[in-house]
Regions:
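C-terminal and inter-domain tail/linker signature
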Residues: 1-147
């Protein structure tokens, strides 16, 4: 039984790595269907986005429109059972509007913790904690402490 869990866990980890590489880094938007369940529950979806796969596609479009050179690096990945946790490094240049912020032309880097719960080979539940404050400071929207 532990072999089955290990294989499933390893498959889920590989799926998260492939998701960031294919969908975001290679801009293969159609590949999102392979990774996200149509009814995925996203606990940290951006305001105004739909749920499920449609919402994930909206979020993808929002990020790639605002940051056309967006790149994710999976720095660490841990899995147990049906959950995968990835520690991410994110970088990009804001060339489009982002959550009501006009383009700044500034390059920014951020970190994020991404958690997915898998069933049937797809993410059915998602959480994302990103350093949004640091991102907004780098874009010049919020002053950094001491400025």
């Amino acid at each position: 039984m532990s072999t089955v869990v290990t294989m499933s866990t390893e498959t889920n980890k590989a799926s998260v790595r492939r998701f960031y590489e294919e969908v975001f880094n290679k801009r293969n938007r159609a590949a999102i269907d392979e990774f996200i369940d149509p009814n995925q529950v996203d606990h940290d979806a951006p305001p105004g986005t739909l749920g499920g796969l449609k919402g994930a596609k909206q979020t993808l479009t929002m990020y790639l429109t605002a940051f056309p050179d967006l790149h994710f690096t999976v720095e660490d990945i841990i899995a147990e059972g049906d959950r995968v946790v990835a520690r991410l490094a994110v970088r990009g240049t804001q060339q489009g509007a982002f959550m009501g912020i006009p383009p700044t032309g500034k390059q920014a880097t951020s970190t994020a913790i991404d958690i997915n719960r898998f069933a049937g080979g797809k993410s059915v539940e998602h959480w994302l904690n990103m350093d949004t404050l640091g991102l907004l400071q780098q874009l010049g929207v919020i002053p950094a402490p001491g400025q």
